[in-house]
Amino acid sequence: MGRVAQISRTAVLAAALQLADEQGLAAVTMHAVARRLHVTPMALYRHVADKDALLDGLVELLLTEYPRPSAEGRWDERLVALADGIRATARRHPAVFPLLLTRPAVTPTARRVRNAVQAALREGGLPDPEAARAERLISTAVLGFAASEAAGRFRHHDQSVIDEDFAELLRWLRRALPVPGDVP
């Protein structure tokens, strides 16, 4: 009798991410991930409850690629570093990145990122309600730009123009924040 392949949640998510990177998000099915891991589809259910849980796991995996939120450095510089990390993640995983726009940000890693952004904004002088709103608006703008770039919307422009546009977006966002301090 053959030996049963041992898999883990990490292996399941890595296989799903690799499959999406190679063939697109539509190719990510429980059967396709199982084939990639040389197991039966039922073996996956020990690690992910269903397709929605698999997609939520992919969101978690993408979020772990962001720079770890730090308390060091200026609050606005930390936000720029995070925005740059988000954009880099979108470039690495253009097929999967749109999940960040459609899946609820309720996982522990999503909350960690959201809380770090809100903490930086509070450090910059925004009170709690405004920090939460600013986080939503900033996240929407940065995720939208990164998703647009990853989807090829800007492909007819030189990369230097796209890079400058992203830097300008971040400057606009910084100027829009009602916090004390000089605008970089």
Identify the function of each model-found stretch.
Residues 1-32, 36-39, 49-56:
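Basic, helix-initiating cap at the start of DNA-binding domains
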Residues 67-106, 135-138:
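Hydrophobic alpha-helical connector segments
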Residues 151-184:
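C-terminal peripheral helix-coil segments that are non-catalytic and often amphipathic
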Residues 47-48, 134:
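Residues in the recognition helix of alpha-helical DNA-binding motifs
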